[in-house]
Every structure is written in C-alpha cells, then in structure tokens.
C-alpha cells in the first residue's frame, strides 16, 4: 500500500500552496535527519516517504514549467 501523498493531490494545488508544502517537507526531512543522527528516530520509513513527497512536488512544478500540466483555476 502506498504511503505518502499521491501526485494527483499535488497537481490540485496552486503554485503558492505547492511551494508551502515543499518548504514544510524540506523542514520535516531536516528534522528527521537530525533525529536519525541523534538516535531518536523511531520510524525510519518516514525519511523515505518525505523524500519521495519532495520529489513528487518537484515533478509537478517541472510539469507546469514545461506546460505538461495546467495550474488549477487558471484560465486557458
């Protein structure tokens, strides 16, 4: 079963929301790596999930730059 946020949910967000989600995910990844280094991390799988979410967000942003995907609410 897939864990994390599916790409279609990211595609429904506008540019500002995507950037906010990206910043939150990067901050969470930083905190998880810090916990791993100090031996406090209990869920190692979360690292992988957050990294994949970050990659999905970057993919959606790049699709929009290339015109492969449309921004929701934007008039064509």
Swiss-Prot record:
Keywords, alphabetical: Ribonucleoprotein, Ribosomal protein
UniProt keyword tRNA-binding present: no
Gene3D superfamilies noted in UniProt: 1.10.287.310
GO molecular function: structural constituent of ribosome
GO biological process terms held by the UniProt record: translation
Any one GO cellular component localisation term in the record: cytosolic large ribosomal subunit
Keyword Lyase found: no
CDD domains: Ribosomal_L29_HIP
Domain of life of the native organism: Bacteria
Family: Belongs to the universal ribosomal protein uL29 family.
Protein name as it appears in the record: Large ribosomal subunit protein uL29
Gene (UniProt): rpmC
């Amino acid at each position: 079963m897939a864990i994390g946020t599916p790409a279609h949910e990211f595609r429904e967000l506008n540019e500002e929301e995507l950037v906010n989600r990206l910043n939150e995910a990067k901050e969470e990844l930083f905190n998880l790596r810090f916990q791993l280094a100090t031996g406090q991390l209990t869920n190692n799988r979360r690292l992988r999930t957050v990294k994949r979410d970050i990659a999905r967000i970057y993919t959606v942003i790049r699709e929009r730059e290339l015109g492969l995907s449309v921004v929701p609410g934007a008039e064509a």
